[in-house]
């Protein structure tokens, strides 16, 4: 006979369980932190970091910033923050590549989840001060007014990886050989991101076309060159 999971809290959270909901609300109202002692002891023992250093400025961080701006969100909670990047399940190698980059940036393994009844994976990680260290505000991305950091814009390798993150997230490449039509497009409704992509492509010597919700490369030579430059849809796990 199959054993059934009879855990007393199965299917509940502290806010929905009939016995815990009232207690949780009381703690919240009185601002009681029942984990404070444990957290302080964990910091002293090194189990929880007392502080979080700035991220190393390298190609992994540049890629992650671009990817987060394109397909990610940073959520703020009372005692932590959560970076979550949503990726199409038809690109499993991109999911693995992104998880590997996050692991290198954070020195911590992220959680990869398949979203039920969807064609989507999420790659996520919890840690304090994610937003301030990435330089990306928490909350809705569509209204975000982002300025590209100088350490990225002034370094070709970092700029290339930043653009790779953006194009892997929101880019599309189409080639119609009978008419010799080439289109490498970055589509987004955020005006500041479109301006950043336009400026970055020009810094690298390209001639982008600007549309209301997209920035495009249309010249055959530039499309082929840029695809190779950013290794678009080519994923080799970084050592």
Regions found by a protein language model. Name each.
Residues 1-239:
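Internal intein/HINT superfamily modules and their associated LAGLIDADG
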């Amino acid at each position: 006979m199959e054993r059934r999971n009879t855990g007393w809290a199965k299917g509940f959270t502290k806010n929905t369980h009939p016995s815990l909901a009232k207690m949780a609300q009381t703690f919240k109202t009185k601002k009681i932190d029942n984990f404070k002692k444990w957290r302080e002891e964990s910091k002293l023992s090194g189990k929880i970091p007392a502080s979080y250093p700035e991220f190393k400025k390298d190609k992994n961080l540049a890629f992650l910033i671009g990817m987060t701006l394109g397909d990610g969100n940073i959520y703020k909670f009372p005692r932590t923050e959560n970076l979550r990047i949503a990726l199409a399940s038809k690109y499993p190698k991109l999911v693995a590549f992104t998880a590997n980059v996050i692991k290198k940036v954070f020195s911590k393994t992220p959680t990869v989840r398949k979203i039920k009844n969807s064609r989507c994976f999420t790659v996520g990680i919890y840690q304090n001060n994610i937003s301030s260290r990435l330089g990306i505000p928490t909350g809705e991305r569509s209204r975000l007014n982002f300025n590209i950091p100088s350490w990225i814009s002034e370094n070709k390798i970092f700029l290339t990886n930043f653009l790779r993150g953006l194009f892997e997230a929101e880019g599309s490449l189409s080639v119609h050989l009978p008419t010799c039509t080439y289109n490498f497009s970055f589509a987004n409704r955020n005006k500041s991101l479109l301006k950043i992509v336009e400026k970055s492509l020009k810094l690298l010597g390209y001639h982008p076309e600007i549309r209301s919700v997209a920035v495009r490369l249309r010249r055959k030579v530039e499309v082929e060159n840029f695809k190779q430059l950013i290794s678009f849809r080519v994923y080799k796990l970084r050592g």
